[in-house]
Amino acid sequence: MASMPKPNQSARGRVTVVLGSQWGDEGKGKLTDMLAGEMDICARCAGGNNAGHTIVANSGPDNVKTKFDFHLLPSGLVNPKCIGFIGSGVVMHVPSFFSELDTIEKKGLKCDNRLFVSDRTHLVFDFHQVVDGLKEVELGGSSIGTTKKGIGPAYSSKASRSGLRVHHLYDFDTFAAKFRKLVEGRFKRYGNFEYDTEGEIARYRAFAERLRPFVVDGVTFIHSMLSSNRRVLVEGANALMLDLDYGTYPFVTSSSTGIGGVCTGLGIPPQCIGGVIGVMKAYTSRVGAGPFPTELNDEIMTHLQEVGAEYGTTTGRRRRCGWLDLVMMRYSCLINGYTCLNLTKLDVLDNLPEIKVATTYMLGDKELSSFPADLNILAKVDVQYKTFKGWRGPISNCTSYEQLPDTCREYIEFIENFLGVHIEWIGVGPGREAMVHRPLPPHEM
């Protein structure tokens, strides 16, 4: 095992982070795919297989365009020279890890000796998934609409200090004893639901040996990479408004999905982070229950759903859609400190006669000065909008900012000025190449 590296000032700024800025499904995977070609490592820092995205990339000996679905593995693996790393802040369902790995390798994407898992990563078991479903049933009309992947119950085990981590697999008798105790606790809470405890233990004995070559001391691994001047791309899961602390609680996920979760999930200090790219749709969507101030229920909503293909990669559920919410985005920018933004799915707005963005929340005759923590207040706000003329034509063939219609650029620049953050990347179509890059002029950097 490599010795623990000393703190290295040369690691300063070598990490680039891609984060969702809304309620997820912003299109982080596309930008991650593009940036991964310039990176040495692509890392996951939080969440589990409860989120997902699809990437189309050339693969195999014939270099054929192939579709890859990523849920748990870092999507930067589509770059055959990029190392994938699952950090300590992730919760990992081992069967899903191997299922996803086997699927992408069958499609020609080989991951031998370039995929690693922190030994501190917590494990998601099948009983966590059963409990997830039972809890949703128990909540009834108050359910939050989880993916039922066991993520919340696994993080609950972690927070209550009863969870099991990857390293526990390599003291298997202790693992088995702790596992039985963990399941017994769930039986006491939810009754004797159908579950084969001993069968699961037997499966994990086999999983432990198959997983062994992937397991590393996560802290030593990531800092050794940074000390070797490797460039790291961090692929955020979910998005800021699903963050356990700063999202629309309790309609959130169970992990830290913002910039703080990057440091705690990978074991790196803040000074290692050189850039934070916030990914935002040109409109807003969310899956499951929870408040949504700009939600639409008309033909515009249908347009956004159909043209934007707003169906969840993980659940297949139709996403709720509405106008871009700049009040929420300003809150997101404050917390995550984006150095630039990637505006995605702008082409979905192509044929709309007019386009709106939310600029103000009013409560009675009072303007709210911040995004409210209290969801009862959020449910009562009146949203004020700025309306733009639509550009009424396709933009998918635009390859430079100057080629975009004037009204389209007006929309982009209003968002940019409102948020005070430069929009560097603009998605103008579903294809990998349909991205306009708009770097800041050197004198403005």
Curated annotation (Swiss-Prot):
One of its GO terms (biological process) is 'de novo' AMP biosynthetic process. InterPro entries: Adenylosuccin_syn_GTP-bd, Adenylosuccin_syn_Lys_AS, Adenylosuccinate_synth_dom1, Adenylosuccinate_synth_dom2, Adenylosuccinate_synth_dom3, Adenylosuccinate_synthetase, P-loop_NTPase. Keywords: Cytoplasm, GTP-binding, Ligase, Magnesium, Metal-binding, Nucleotide-binding, Purine biosynthesis. Its EC number is 6.3.4.4. It holds the Pfam family Adenylsucc_synt. The keyword GTP-binding applies. Substrate binds at residues 313-319. It is found in: Cytoplasm. PROSITE patterns: ADENYLOSUCCIN_SYN_1, ADENYLOSUCCIN_SYN_2. The active site is at 25 (proton acceptor), 53 (proton donor). Binds 1 Mg(2+) ion per subunit. It is an enzyme of class 6 (ligase). Mg(2+) binds at residues 25, 52. SUPFAM superfamilies: P-loop containing nucleoside triphosphate hydrolases. Pathway: Purine metabolism; AMP biosynthesis via de novo pathway; AMP from IMP: step 1/2. GO terms for cellular component: cytoplasm. Its cofactor is Mg(2+). PANTHER family: ADENYLOSUCCINATE SYNTHETASE. Belongs to the adenylosuccinate synthetase family. This is Adenylosuccinate synthetase. It comes from Malassezia globosa (strain ATCC MYA-4612 / CBS 7966).
